């Protein structure tokens, strides 16, 4: 019988963050958490950033040091988006030890994003 390798175990993943799981998933995480608040149904910069996260960032070695998640501001993340002070999308916030430590608004190239995350979590 041929064994199938589950490639998702070898790289990071992009977790869905909702109003219901935000506290346990993000604030109580033992690793820093990079959370992108976006509106994928209508926001082109959000779609662009989501593709970069999904295709490049979570496969980068940085994903071993941090968790990545995305919040749908128009759906399951309305309350946490408001509580986080999100005023525009995409907004990415880095949380460490339950606290917001850095914030970036807009979409950026993958290397700029990685450099920003690395500098924030040291």
Which residue stretches match the model-derived regions?
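N-terminal leader/targeting and pre-domain segments
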Residues: 1-33, 110-122
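Chalcogenol-based redox active-site neighborhoods
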Residues: 2-12, 47-51, 70-71, 83-84, ...
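Thiol-based oxidoreductase modules, predominantly thioredoxin-like and allied folds used
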Residues: 15-18, 37-39, 50, 54-78
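Nucleotide phosphate-binding site architecture
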Residues: 23, 44, 74, 101
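Short pre-active-site segment immediately N-terminal to redox-active cysteine/selenocysteine motifs
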Residues: 30, 38-42, 88
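The canonical Cys-X-X-Cys-His
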Residues: 43-46, 92
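Structural alpha/beta surface segment adjacent to cysteine/selenocysteine redox centers
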Residues: 79-89
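Non-catalytic, surface beta->alpha helical segment in thiol-disulfide oxidoreductase systems
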Residues: 88-122
């Amino acid at each position: 019988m041929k064994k199938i390798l589950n490639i998702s175990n070898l790289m990071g993943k992009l977790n869905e963050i909702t109003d219901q799981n935000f506290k346990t998933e993000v604030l109580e995480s033992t690793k820093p958490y990079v959370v992108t608040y976006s509106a994928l149904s209508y926001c082109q910069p959000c779609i662009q950033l989501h593709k970069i996260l999904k295709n490049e960032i979570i496969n980068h070695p940085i994903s071993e040091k941090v968790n990545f998640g995305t919040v749908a501001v128009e759906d399951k993340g309305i309350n946490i988006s408001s509580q986080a002070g999100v005023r525009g999308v995409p907004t990415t916030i880095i949380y460490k030890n339950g606290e917001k430590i850095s914030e970036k608004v807009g979409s950026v190239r993958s290397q700029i994003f990685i450099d920003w995350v690395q500098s924030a979590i040291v």
